[in-house]
């Protein structure tokens, strides 16, 4: 301990910041005179109530007292991890308001044995009143926001993550998001009964956006998106609810986009992604996937998921409209549904020979060597005149004999590009 005590304050504070609980940080004050006041300057604090058998009142008093004694001019990260809540989060927010916090995390640990679906933090709207002038990063998970007359304002917030949050209604959450004038990164994961049917994201400064809707949302209730983000560069949409759709979108600077959706209503959103350079698609159908005549002229990297029945039609359609594509990856990202039929290859009706004039890299992950898969690989090797590298990674649950059979049946002679290097590997 004497040797550790001789270290510089900055190094010791960094070590204390790694402790899993603020209670452990405060406890170091009894080690020696050297440590007595050191904890008061720790830049990152985690208040973890998720595993302790203490009542919430005792926990909240500890939060209030320890933060009142804290002397650091700025707290880089203040994290409240809660397993059971009685009452509201007024004490937590009140204590946090006494400090200059850059990053604030408030969440219930739903894996805790003491937590339940009814245990949720009700946060006062003083959190959104602009008192946190320095707050640049905010994450809320499994909490309830209540509506009051306090104006919503986050003047310095650049990153906002809202996961399984319940709101007073559409207007409230839309105002909350639009009240962040310098916001650059937004993640919204909706939950059932969140009181939001139309999520509007209207932020001129936003650069990254992730919208997530899981299957537990009510299917018969519409869940729509309105996206007005002229500076957006990175978009991710995960939607397993079948009925959701983007009703309006303004995105002119997209660089990367990921669309993993069950809903066939993708025409509006994909029609706005013509500037993207990297695109991931897992779509249920190619019909009306995006407007006829759209060209992905900037697209250089395409990844297609093979879990849906019509993945092959989606692939061919996008290839037709991507004249500058350089990298193509095919992979099964989700489990197959046994009742769904698999696609069949029909080269004469599906594909013209002028596809893939710029393709240089081709990769297929979870390749099983089916008849259709072999036909698709052979076609790509035959028409990709600039191909430099083709990599096939086998499905990991295939036995050794089947892998050897796949290797022997691989269409090596189909290569049109003499410079193409073939690699066949096993997915372990």
Curated annotation (Swiss-Prot):
This is Putative FBD-associated F-box protein At5g56390. Residues 344-394 form the FBD domain. InterPro entries: F-box-like_dom_sf (IPR036047), F-box_dom (IPR001810), FBD (IPR006566), FBL13/AtMIF1-like (IPR050232), LRR_dom_sf (IPR032675), LRR_FXL15/At3g58940/PEG3-like (IPR055411). It holds the Pfam family F-box. It comes from the Eukaryota. SUPFAM superfamilies: F-box domain, RNI-like. Residues 2-50 form the F-box domain.
